[in-house]
C-alpha cells in the first residue's frame, strides 16, 4: 500500500488519490493473475503436445498396432525364467549351456540330420545348407534348410542367433510364413532348422512364367489374374498376422516370397521385423531397395504396417508384369523426388482397372489414407470372384538380371536364390 501511494504521490488526507490508488490495484492484481494463468496453461499445453508427439512416434496412424518396446534377449530364458549372464564374464560354452534349456522343445538331435549337407548360399548369419531330416520313417525323409552361424563366432553373435530363434517362438506358426522346424544349439556349430520351400522365390517364378514353358518340376509356370489375387491374399494374411504381433515386415517384395508347388506363398526375409521386435525400431544400417519403400521410409520417418501396404502395391505391379522392375523410367536415386511430385506408376497393359485401383489405394501419400492389410484383403477377396482365371499373363521379353538389377536398384548377387528367412 505504501509503495502504491508513493507512486501516485498520495497523502493520507487525499481521498480522491486514495480512490485512484484502489482502482490501480483493481487493475494490477487481476492482470497478474491472468498472466500467471496463461503461463501455466501454456506449459501444460506444451507438455501435452510433447507427449502426443512421442506417442505418435511410437505408433502409426489410427488403427495401427504400436511398436513394441525394445527387448533385451540376453536375459530371456522362456518358461517364465531369466538367464542372468553378464556377457563380459561368460564364455560361449557357458552361455549355450544356460540358454539351451529355454529352447529344449525346439532341439533337433543332430543324428536326425543327414551327414552330407548341400550348401545352397550364404546368408547374413552364415552358410545355408539343404539337408534331410529323419522323420521316423526311413522311406520318408524330410528336406529342411539349415541356417548355420558362421564360425568363429563371438558371444554377441551367438546371442543374436539365439535371439532370432526366440523370435520364432514369439511369432508361432502361420501357413504363410516360413516355419521353424527346430534348432541345434546345445553346442557349436549352431543351426536353425527351417522348412524347405523348394520352388524358390516368387520373382524367379515370375521370370520363368515369361518363358515358353508349360511345366517344370511338376509346377505349372503360368499366371492368371485370379492367381495374382490368390497370391496377394496370402501375403496380406501374413502381414495381418505380423500386425497382430505389433510388428511389420519392412521389405515386402517378390524376392522375399517363397512359393510351393500348389502356389502357396510364404513370406520370408523377416530381418527387419526381428529388429523391431528387439530394438523397437528399424536400424539405419539396413539397406532396402529404394523403389519398394513408402515415402515416409524414404524420408527416414517412423515406419508402420502402412509402409508395408505401399510395398504391397509394388508387389502387385511385379506380379501383373511378370517381374518387371518398378518405375523403370526413374533412376533409383531420384525416386523420392519423383514421389514428392505425387507421381505414381501408370497402369500396365496387362493390369485390369480393378487391380490398378487397388494399387493406387496402396500408393496414397499419407499413410493414414492407405487401407489396412485386412481392408486390402477384403478388396482382393471381392475381386477374386470376378477375376479372369483363363487368360494367362504374357510378357514376351526375357529378363536380363544385370539390367534388371540396375533399373531396380538392387545388387545382382541378391537375385540368385537366397533362402533369407532372417
Swiss-Prot record:
EC annotation from Swiss-Prot or TrEMBL: 2.7.10.2
Disulfide bond entries: none
Cited PROSITE patterns: PROTEIN_KINASE_DOM, PROTEIN_KINASE_TYR
Keyword Metal-binding part of the UniProt annotation: no
Keywords: ATP-binding, Kinase, Membrane, Nucleotide-binding, Proto-oncogene, Transferase, Transmembrane, Transmembrane helix, Tyrosine-protein kinase
Mode of membrane association: Single-pass membrane protein
PANTHER family on file: SERINE_THREONINE_TYROSINE KINASE 1, TYROSINE-PROTEIN KINASE RECEPTOR
Active site (UniProt): 251
Role summary: Probable tyrosine protein-kinase, which has strong transforming capabilities on a variety of cell lines. When overexpressed, it can also induce tumor cell invasion as well as metastasis in distant organs. May act by activating both MAP kinase and phosphatidylinositol 3'-kinases (PI3K) pathways.
Name of protein: Tyrosine-protein kinase STYK1
Amino acid at each position: 500500500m505504501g509503495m502504491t501511494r508513493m507512486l501516485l504521490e498520495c497523502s493520507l488526507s487525499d481521498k480522491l488519490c486514495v480512490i485512484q490508488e484502489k482502482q490501480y490495484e483493481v487493475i494490477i492484481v487481476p492482470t497478474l493473475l491472468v498472466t500467471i494463468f496463461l503461463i501455466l496453461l501454456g506449459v501444460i499445453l506444451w507438455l501435452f503436445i510433447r507427449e502426443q508427439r512421442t506417442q505418435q512416434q511410437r505408433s502409426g496412424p489410427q488403427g495401427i498396432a504400436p511398436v513394441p518396446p525394445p527387448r533385451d534377449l540376453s536375459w530371456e530364458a522362456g518358461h517364465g525364467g531369466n538367464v542372468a549372464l553378464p556377457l563380459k564374464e561368460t564364455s560361449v560354452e557357458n552361455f549355450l549351456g544356460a540358454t539351451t534349456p529355454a529352447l529344449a522343445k525346439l532341439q533337433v538331435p543332430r543324428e536326425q540330420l543327414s551327414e552330407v549337407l548341400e550348401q545352397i548360399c550364404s546368408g547374413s548369419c552364415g552358410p545355408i545348407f539343404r539337408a534331410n531330416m529323419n522323420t521316423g520313417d526311413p522311406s520318408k525323409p524330410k528336406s529342411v534348410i539349415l541356417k548355420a552361424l558362421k564360425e568363429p563366432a563371438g558371444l554377441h553373435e551367438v546371442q543374436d542367433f539365439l535371439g532370432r530363434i526366440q523370435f520364432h517362438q514369439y511369432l508361432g506358426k502361420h501357413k504363410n510364413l516360413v516355419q521353424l522346424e527346430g534348432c541345434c544349439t546345445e553346442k557349436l556349430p549352431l543351426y536353425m532348422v527351417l522348412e524347405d520351400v523348394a520352388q524358390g522365390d516368387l520373382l524367379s517364378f515370375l521370370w520363368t512364367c515369361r518363358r515358353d514353358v508349360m511345366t517344370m518340376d511338376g509346377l505349372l509356370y503360368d499366371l492368371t489374374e485370379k492367381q495374382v489375387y490368390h497370391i496377394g491374399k496370402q501375403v496380406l494374411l501374413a502381414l495381418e498376422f505380423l500386425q497382430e504381433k505389433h510388428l511389420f515386415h519392412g521389405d515386402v517384395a517378390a524376392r522375399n516370397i517363397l512359393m510351393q508347388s500348389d502356389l502357396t506363398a510364404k513370406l520370408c526375409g523377416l530381418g527387419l521385423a526381428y529388429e523391431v521386435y528387439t530394438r523397437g525400431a528399424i536400424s539405419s544400417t539396413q539397406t532396402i531397395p529404394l523403389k519398394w519403400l513408402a515415402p515416409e521410409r524414404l524420408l527416414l520417418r517412423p515406419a508402420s504396417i502402412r509402409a508395408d501396404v505401399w510395398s504391397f502395391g509394388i508387389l502387385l505391379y511385379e506380379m501383373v508384369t511378370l517381374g518387371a522392375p518398378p518405375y523403370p523410367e526413374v533412376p533409383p536415386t531420384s525416386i523420392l523426388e519423383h514421389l514428392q511430385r505425387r507421381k505414381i506408376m501408370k497402369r500396365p497393359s496387362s493390369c485390369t482397372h480393378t487391380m490398378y485401383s487397388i494399387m493406387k489405394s496402396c500408393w496414397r501419400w499419407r499413410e493414414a489414407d492407405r487401407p489396412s492389410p485386412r481392408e486390402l484383403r477384403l478388396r482382393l477377396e471381392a475381386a477374386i470372384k470376378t477375376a479372369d482365371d483363363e487368360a494367362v499373363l504374357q510378357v514376351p521379353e526375357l529378363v536380363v538380371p544385370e539390367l534388371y538389377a540396375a533399373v531396380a536398384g538392387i545388387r545382382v548377387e541378391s537375385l540368385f536364390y537366397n533362402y533369407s528367412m532372417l
